């Protein structure tokens, strides 16, 4: 049976933990088997491509890496929790 995640392709999310904390973007792909997701503009990795007819010199391609699902929160939920914290009275 397939596992259900709180994010799906096309959702706006915020990274709430890890080295990419604070970054946000759109979910491009959910890797269910690995419990990871690719987020637009987050966790960029470089891939070295060898010489070919399309790239006679070879090239370095940059693409999105994956982030674990547990480190993501929906943008709407994140904004709501932020507003709730700001509205709470300060304890004296």
From Swiss-Prot:
Residue ranges crossing the lipid bilayer per the database entry: none
PANTHER family linked: MITOCHONDRIAL RIBOSOMAL PROTEIN L24
Organism: Opitutus terrae (strain DSM 11246 / JCM 15787 / PB90-1)
Record CDD domains: KOW_RPL26
Function: One of two assembly initiator proteins, it binds directly to the 5'-end of the 23S rRNA, where it nucleates assembly of the 50S subunit.
This protein's name: Large ribosomal subunit protein uL24
Domain of life per record: Bacteria
Family statement drawn from the similarity comment of this UniProt entry: Belongs to the universal ribosomal protein uL24 family.
A Pfam family that the UniProt record links to this protein: ribosomal_L24
The encoding gene: rplX
Keywords of this entry: Ribonucleoprotein, Ribosomal protein, RNA-binding, rRNA-binding
Oligomer and partners: Part of the 50S ribosomal subunit.
Coiled-coil region: none
Keyword Acetylation: no
GO terms (BP aspect): translation
